């Protein structure tokens, strides 16, 4: 049987605190690059991944975070470039919980090949629609 002293000394079970991300309440956030560099992924994978250290402003505070630079080939980012950040971690890079959105602010990049699949992830327009708009016939 449990005694009163044991009841008194027992710790109360508290509810688990949820971690807040830096983008809580915002779908995207504007920031600027502090450092652009490459890093290597965790154990079974092997590559050179491009990442950027970005500073964002939250209620008169400045917070630093690490964001993944998506896409193939070279990019035009350098320190003090303005970028748009969205959530989404990179699974094989520890500490990288955010991604940069292409074709916004200073992160303008043109790929060297026509992208036909997953265009919305990389902000690429549909080439078929471009061709149709160029050959529109006017009646009247």
Swiss-Prot record:
Organism of provenance: Dictyostelium citrinum (Slime mold)
Family: Belongs to the universal ribosomal protein uS12 family.
Pfam families in UniProt: Ribosom_S12_S23
UniProt-recorded name of the protein: Small ribosomal subunit protein uS12m
Location of this chain's protein in the cell: Mitochondrion
NCBIfam families, A to Z: rpsL_bact
GO biological process, one term: translation
GO cellular component: mitochondrion; small ribosomal subunit
Lineage: superkingdom: Eukaryota
């Amino acid at each position: 049987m449990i005694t009163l002293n044991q009841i008194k000394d027992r710790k109360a079970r508290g509810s688990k605190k949820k971690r807040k991300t830096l983008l809580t309440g915002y779908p995207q956030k504007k920031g600027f690059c502090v450092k652009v560099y490459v890093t290597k992924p965790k154990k079974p994978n092997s590559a050179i991944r491009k990442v950027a250290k970005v500073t964002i402003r939250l209620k008169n505070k400045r917070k630093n975070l690490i964001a993944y630079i998506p896409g193939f080939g070279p990019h035009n980012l350098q320190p003090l470039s303005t970028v748009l950040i969205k959530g989404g971690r990179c699974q094989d890079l520890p500490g990288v919980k955010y991604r940069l959105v292409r074709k916004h602010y200073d992160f303008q990049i043109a790929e060297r090949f026509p992208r036909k699949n997953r265009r919305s992830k990389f902000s690429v327009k549909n080439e078929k629609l471009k061709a149709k708009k160029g050959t529109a016939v006017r009646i009247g």
